[in-house]
From Swiss-Prot:
The protein's enzyme class: hydrolase
Stated name of the protein: Ubiquitin carboxyl-terminal hydrolase MINDY-2
Site, as annotated: Ubiquitin-binding: D520, L523, A524, L527
Residue positions where Phosphoserine is found in the record: S82
Source organism of the structure: Mus musculus (Mouse)
Residue positions where Phosphothreonine is found in the record: T62
Biased composition (Basic and acidic residues): 24-34, 577-601
GO molecular function, one term: K6-linked polyubiquitin modification-dependent protein binding
Documented EC number(s): 3.4.19.12
GO biological process assignments: proteolysis
Keyword Disulfide bond: no
Length: 601
């Protein structure tokens, strides 16, 4: 057969060995479908069918390390068993393992044999129609040299390695005979994030360990489920306090219900987040636009894909001090434009301070730093003064938020708007509720705190109030949950420790060695410590004396009660006891008379 642009081309060794990742197959499918004469595969959904047909023809990978199309293992096993079993079935056939009858039928249809170990040739029947314009296999022929890369097919995802496939989260048994359901049912939609379907059935700890083994060096994030507008909604928490715009963007899409995760999913990897984001960017492509708008959109998509991997670490955002939405134009800002997510900052110059306005002007942050360096080296005193004022402005607003900027943010952000806020080189999800700005709490330390979802942004110091998902202030701990006896014991222990500490400090003070130049404050502190020590010692002595009295009183009463207990007749003869009570009284009266008589003498 003569090689023509439409005829299949020989596969490379890397393809036969199973080193082609699913995103490459997806990119090639999108590129050929868009540039081909059959129409746009992305718009019509042919890309998903092509990817599904590719998976059905080559089988799912059977090990975590085998992330490609998996053709190498099938061809090697087929070559060792029978020559006919190494044939690659054409599109439309769902079984992967080739029986002798299937091999004979394939040989009768004219499928090409396998050549050397380095290359293989896949030929399909000329009479088979192609309704969708998508390639018949993920291991398809390379694009012609004159082809321009399609910008809506995730062309720049090569630096993200390969996304996890669904077989990595399923059992390895029966991987060769599994038939994708989307091929049988004729599903034509774009591929969704399949690897997350089994998360809800597996132990999160096992999934976390498996994810770290399969994707070494990748970040794993925990998911917190909240009740957002009466809907069970997930948000991604952050394990490290670093610049991570990926989480801020995904949380905006999750709160807006534009991206959905499987129910009760608890962990997710960074690569899976990138896959969700890439799928949404493809779905959000405008359908009916003019040719000029389409070219502009494709250029923006190309620029966004080139920096998409930076979302995991940080974006180079260069703010201007004149407006809350004024940034220097960089490719990093195109991502927010494509996703239609507003990006704000609050690092503004107060227009009422003329010298700062004159020193800063319309400079961006990078330009202002360069201006400060040049002004310091200048011989002009006016330039030196401007550089000093600009440097003071940066030092005084190190939190990257001013009160003027906070006021502008409050008036600019729309009610209920979900956006991304840039401050302290960190990206946060922000919204506005009843005229008050709130930042989404994504710290992993609050993963189990269901009542802590938002934090108010009402000053530049960063000491906001925590609120729940309905923007109610977090109530204090329930008094019933605090054990009173335990709290009393804690208070007593604290007072005892404080008393012992004060006593020890007072004993260490040597009043004879007090320097003459001691200040009044230090002398007053020492006197107060001595007074506290004496007071505590006095109270301790009082308590000990009271304890001695309480212990001696029962003993004396017991000694007085022994004679009464010794005579059993005292109980039966009440008259005798009355006489005994009267006798001491009479003796006391006689003594008083004797005293009085002595006084008269």
């Amino acid at each position: 057969m003569e090689n023509s642009p439409d005829s299949p081309q020989p596969l490379e060794l890397g393809v036969a060995a199973g080193r082609v990742s699913p995103p490459e197959g997806r990119r090639r499918g999108g590129r050929e479908a868009e540039d081909g004469p059959a129409g746009r595969a992305v718009d019509s959904g042919g890309q998903g069918a092509a990817a599904a047909a590719a998976r059905s023809s080559l089988g799912d990978p059977t090990s975590p390390s085998q992330l490609g199309c998996g053709a190498g293992s099938d061809l090697k096993d087929g070559a060792s068993s029978s020559p006919a079993a190494s044939e690659v079935p054409s599109r439309g056939q769902h079984k992967v393992t080739a029986s002798p009858e299937l091999a004979e039928a394939a040989a009768g249809r004219g499928s090409g044999p396998v050549g050397d170990t380095g290359t293989c040739r896949v030929e399909q029947a000329a009479e088979e129609p192609s309704s969708t314009g998508a390639p018949s296999s993920s291991c398809s022929e390379p694009s012609p040299p004159g082809d321009s890369p399609s910008l809506d097919s995730l062309e720049s995802f090569s630096n993200l390695h390969s996304f996890p496939s669904s077989s990595e989260f399923n059992s390895e048994e029966g991987a060769e005979t599994r038939v994708p359901e989307d091929v049988e049912e004729g599903a034509a939609g774009p591929p969704r994030a399949a690897p997350l379907c089994k998360e809800e059935e597996e132990d999160p700890a096992q999934v976390l360990a498996a994810s770290k083994e399969r994707f070494p060096g990748q970040s794993v994030y925990h998911i917190k489920w909240i009740q957002w507008k009466e809907e069970n909604t997930p948000i991604i928490t952050q394990n490290e306090n670093g610049p991570c715009p990926l989480l801020a963007i995904l949380n905006v899409l999750l709160l807006a219900w534009k991206v959905k995760l499987p129910p009760m999913m608890e962990i997710i990897t960074a690569e899976q987040l990138m896959e969700y984001l890439g799928d949404y960017m493809l779905e959000a492509k405008p359908k009916e636009i003019s040719e000029i708008q389409r070219v502009n959109y494709e250029q923006n998509m190309s620029d966004a894909m080139a920096i998409l991997h930076k979302l995991q670490t940080g974006l180079d955002v260069n703010v201007r001090f004149t407006g809350v939405r004024v940034f220097e134009y960089t490719p990093e800002c195109i991502v927010f434009d494509l996703l239609d997510i507003p990006l704000y900052h609050g690092w503004l110059v107060d227009p009422q301070i003329d010298d700062i306005v004159k020193a800063v002007g319309n400079c961006s942050y990078n330009q202002l730093v360069e201006k400060i360096i040049s002004c310091k080296q200048s011989d002009n005193s006016q330039l030196v003064s401007e550089g000093f004022v600009a440097e003071q402005f940066l030092n005084n607003t190190a939190t990257q938020l001013t009160y003027h900027g906070l006021c502008e943010l409050t008036s600019t952000v729309q009610e209920g708007e979900l956006c991304v806020f840039f401050r302290n080189n960190h990206f946060s999800t922000m919204t506005k509720y009843k005229g008050q700005l709130y930042l989404l709490v994504t710290d992993q330390g609050f993963l189990t705190e269901e009542k802590i979802v938002w934090e108010s942004l009402h000053n530049v110091d960063g000491d906001g109030n925590f609120c729940d998902s309905e923007f109610h202030l977090r109530p204090p701990s329930d008094p019933e949950t605090v054990y009173k006896g335990q709290q009393d014991q804690i208070d007593q222990d604290y007072l005892m420790a404080l008393s012992l500490q004060q006593e020890q400090q007072s004993q260490e003070i040597n009043w004879e060695q007090i320097p003459e130049g001691i200040s009044d404050l230090e002398l007053a502190k020492k006197l107060q410590e001595e007074e506290d020590r004496r007071a505590s010692q006095y109270y301790q002595e009082q308590e000990q004396a009271q304890a001695v009295v309480t212990t001696t009183t029962p003993s004396t009463q017991a000694q007085q009660g022994q004679p009464a207990q010794a005579s059993p007749s005292s109980i039966k003869q009440p008259g005798n006891s009355e006489r005994k009570r009267k006798e001491p009284r009479e003796k006391d009266k006689e003594k008083e008379k004797e005293k009085n008589s002595c006084v008269i003498l």
